[in-house]
């Protein structure tokens, strides 16, 4: 099966997923809004700002013109930052209408839209009419782009309300080192993918403050409980959160310096000012906006999320990190489950 696939977003994850698809023999068009990045990808076959020491195949072609990238596509993979996905989807919708196309839609972005607090599949469904798309599938799981670039073993989930769409995405991506499972719980997979970045911020902060493994394990375990509570309030399957998009994604994101959210938390824990961390990170720190979204959703739905609330207070209200930790530890005793 060789498909025409447009990959929208040429950051670290988008460009490496494009490389996996290209390696599988698909006709891949990698789109970026940055003409200089497109030129580098097409002439030097590198993407040095995002992926160091990696050379892309010459068969992978980058585009700065969105309509050209979408010509006659069978599938579109969105890997743009959360804040840009609605705008890009709106542009895509116009082009699909003009070209009378109805491709498969996939997204591998991890976040919740600000203001609306909607999942990204909901945003895509709102912006792209049903007559110009198939069912939306989410590709997510414990996956650092750097590891996939080295062809380290990686397992992810393709989640969709349509079993056929999930299996289609599974077939697109499967390689000897990149294994894809299917899951019908698109709600749980998206919520797990987004909210684990909050826990990664906290884990990085604990490291920066000098806390040990016990504290980090406690954070990840109780953080996962919070994610599960919020997810199930939306109808997610609790089993999803002990799978690749729950436990798996938390482990890889909250224990590794490859995670930009972990690195941001680490710097905050070491006393860096938030604005300075944002300015020199050089890439989007999705966990910052997701913290606000999750905090607001928890209050709206009456879901207890004390860790998320503490991280929100540190980021948005300027609360001292050590005070926030102390307040968490001094909460009234209760049953674990």
From Swiss-Prot:
Has UniProt tagged this entry with the keyword Lyase?
no
Gene3D superfamilies found in the cross-reference section = N-(1-d-carboxylethyl)-l-norvaline Dehydrogenase, domain 2, NAD(P)-binding Rossmann-like Domain
| Enzyme Commission identifier(s) | 1.1.1.94
Give the pathway annotation: Membrane lipid metabolism; glycerophospholipid metabolism
Q: Which Pfam families match?
A: NAD_Gly3P_dh_C, NAD_Gly3P_dh_N
Q: Which GO terms describe its molecular function?
A: glycerol-3-phosphate dehydrogenase [NAD(P)+] activity; NAD binding
Query: Domain of life, per the record?
Result: Bacteria
Annotated residues that bind sn-glycerol 3-phosphate are located at 110, 141, 143, 196, 249, 259-261
Q: Is Cell division there in the keyword field?
A: no
Q: Any idea which UniProt keywords this protein has?
A: Cytoplasm, Lipid biosynthesis, Lipid metabolism, NAD, NADP, Nucleotide-binding, Oxidoreductase, Phospholipid biosynthesis, Phospholipid metabolism
Read off the InterPro entries from this record: 6-PGluconate_DH-like_C_sf, 6PGD_dom2, G3P_DH_NAD-dep, G3P_DH_NAD-dep_C, G3P_DH_NAD-dep_N, NAD(P)-bd_dom_sf
What are the TM regions of this chain, as residue ranges?
none
Q: What does this protein do?
A: Catalyzes the reduction of the glycolytic intermediate dihydroxyacetone phosphate (DHAP) to sn-glycerol 3-phosphate (G3P), the key precursor for phospholipid synthesis.
* Similarity annotation: Belongs to the NAD-dependent glycerol-3-phosphate dehydrogenase family.
Q: What is this protein called?
A: Glycerol-3-phosphate dehydrogenase [NAD(P)+]
